Design a protein with these regions (language model features):
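Structural motif detector for alpha-helix initiation sites
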Residues: 5, 23-24, 38, 55, ...
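Phosphopantetheine carrier-protein modules
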Residues: 13-30, 48-60
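Phosphopantetheine-attachment site and its flanking helix in carrier
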Residues: 29-48
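Generic structural marker for isolated residues within well-ordered, non-membrane alpha-helices
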Residues: 9, 24, 42
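Thiotemplate assembly-line natural product biosynthesis machinery
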Residues: 1-20, 72-76
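C-terminal structural segments of small proteins and small subunits
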Residues: 52-54, 58-74
Length: 76
């Protein structure tokens, strides 16, 4: 499955109920997400793209662009 940044932003948008999301908008600081929201985003990404993200890695992926790079790298 080919992943695009739009795929990731769609997941974030659905989880947070926000229509417009920039590639580099930080989930917590700029989009107003709470910790549980971020966990839900991560779980949705894991399920959609069939990969595992360790809890300790979550702070390393605070934006849609960062999550996109992770999914793209692990999908190859």
């Amino acid at each position: 499955m080919t992943v695009t940044i739009e795929d990731i932003k769609r997941i974030v948008s659905l989880q947070l109920g926000i229509r417009e999301i920039g590639d580099d908008d930080r989930f917590l600081e700029e989009l107003g997400a709470e910790s549980l929201d971020v966990m839900n985003i991560i779980v949705a990404v894991e399920e959609k793209f069939n990969l595992q993200i360790k809890d300790s890695e979550i702070p390393d992926y605070p934006t849609s662009a960062a999550l996109f790079k992770l999914v793209k790298d692990r999908s190859q």
